Amino acid sequence: MSLSKLKAPKGANRERTRVGRGQGSGLGKTAGRGGKGQKARSGNMHFEGFEGGQMPLQRRLPKFGFKNVFRREFEEVKVGDLDGLSGVVDPAALKGAGLVRGNRDGVVVLGGGELKSAVTVKVHRVTAGARAAIEKAGGTVELIPAPVTMYEKAKAARKAQAKK
């Protein structure tokens, strides 16, 4: 048995059926589309949610919520993931260990799992449960300021301009 001798199971690769090629084929004349009507025509399909001219459900329901474009997104690390690390654990160490990618607005430690070794954790946010677990293991937590976003820089510049 080798890869070059493998074959697809019988019936797996079917030839494309050619429709509209005479009545003897079983798919002649209307080509499996039934009689007349919108669905029998080319370019027939109306858009998803169309209800025949009646106001569609997605337009009958009220709008709600919004997406905050200035929202800060933090990468999440669980306390249990810190167990293999030692010494000072900061975003650079977490990135080196492959626990975060480093492409968000900071790192937050969540309280899932157990920590057996004492570590100094320097991150942007820590939940109460995570802080308790780290301190129970004999470690310490230091909060570092989150990186300043482009929006915050622009806001500060506008504020400084208004004072002048």
Curated annotation (Swiss-Prot):
SUPFAM superfamilies cross-referenced by the UniProt entry: Ribosomal proteins L15p and L18e
Gene3D superfamilies noted in UniProt: 3.100.10.10
GO biological process: translation
Entry annotated with the keyword rRNA-binding: yes
Keywords: Ribonucleoprotein, Ribosomal protein, RNA-binding, rRNA-binding
Entry's Gene Ontology molecular function annotations: rRNA binding; structural constituent of ribosome
Biased composition (Gly residues): 21-37
Disordered, as annotated region: 1-52
GO cellular-component term (any): cytosolic large ribosomal subunit
One Pfam family of this chain: Ribosomal_L27A
Family designation: Belongs to the universal ribosomal protein uL15 family.
Assembly, per entry: Part of the 50S ribosomal subunit.
HAMAP family linked: Ribosomal_uL15 (MF_01341)
Function: Binds to the 23S rRNA.
Name of the protein in question: Large ribosomal subunit protein uL15
Gene expressing this chain: rplO
